[in-house]
Each structure stands twice: as C-alpha cells, then as structure tokens.
C-alpha cells in the first residue's frame, strides 16, 4: 500500500505508512518491477514524498529490475525537482554513490550512468522536435521537457557526475552521444567544461571512431559543418584513423 500512496502523491498517508514499514523493516519492499516506494515516488514525480522517504531511511542505492537507481530514473525522465529535493541540500545527489553507477549491460541496457541517461533522453527529444507534424502545443511541451533535462544535466555535473565516464557496451562518453545526434547545444556545454583539461577527451575512441569521425558522418541537416568545426577548434585530430583505417574526412557523406 505504501507504493500506491507514493504513486498517487498522498504525502500524509505515505509518511505514516513509511514509519510503520520502517518498524517492520519493509521500507524498501519491492513491487513486481523491482521498484521500492522511493523509486515509485521518483517515477511518479513526487519530490516531496521522495524527500520524506529518504528522511525516513529509504535506501537511495536501491535499484529496480533493470538496474535503475533513483538517480537514473530522475535523470532519464528529466525530473529536475526530484534531483533538487530539499530546500538547500539535494538529498539524492548529496549522497552521490549512484552518480557513477552504471546500469548493468543486461536487457538492452548498455551500462549507462545517470548522466548518460539524461543526455540520451535529451537527444530523443531533439529527434521528436524535428518532426514536421507537431502542433504548436506539442512543440512547447517538448521544449519544456528539453529545458528540464538540461537542468538535470547541469545539476548532475555540478554535483560530481563525470563527463569522462564511458558506457560499458560501446565505450562512448557523453561527447560521442551528443555528436551522434547532432546535439550542438550539449556538445558546446561539454566541450567548454573540458576546456584546458583532458587533451584526450575530444579524441577518445568508441568502437574505433572518434567524435570527429562521427561528426563527419552526420547528414548535413544535423549541424554537421558546425559540429566538425567545433571539434576541430577544441583539439580534435583529423589524422586519427579508425578500425577500417579511415580518417574522419573519409566518413563524410558523398556529395
């Protein structure tokens, strides 16, 4: 019943039930998808209840059947308020044991950190926004979601999430993910964060390809020219070859 109260935003009932479940050592009981009441509250976008459950002693490290922690879920859905829960302290992030935790490479989840999840979700929204059939209301809704995800990304980075983390399956960093979808706004953000730091960041390989290889292969309507120039301006090496012995220039679409 605690899961139901949390999902419906019934704060008073949730808190009372949580205190009772804590006494029974069942505060982190899981439902059929492996979600604890805390994970249900995060998914239901109930920041006040998230705060209450954590204060009551809910396990912030708990994961569901897909290996998703509260941070992974909040980042994926773009729930900035959940990440900001609490007035001056971001409770979930302050206990940042999950900032660098990877989703297990099972069931199609290629080992993503919460930051990877947020970037991929932002990319997906960009693809939706490019659809020509959207109404003005739909475009506004997507823009709002996009801004919330950007806020989540900034929060994660500000509190210690590493832009250098690679996913388990493909070895990609957030740089590769932003480039492959032509996400120029996030690309600029990550490149500026890296300025004068790691010389290898821009030239790291994923499946043998650098970000510049990926940028060169982009269609021209995905900011290809601007992204290539940005990468070059930040130290991308056009002479690096991939596993097929191709340099980035060889990856460009014909014509």
Where are these regions (language model features)?
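Ankyrin-repeat boundary/linker signal
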Residues: 30, 63, 95, 104-107, ...
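Start-of-repeat signature of ankyrin repeats
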Residues: 34, 67, 111, 170-171, ...
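C-terminal interaction modules of eukaryotic adaptor/scaffold proteins
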Residues: 213-217, 221-255
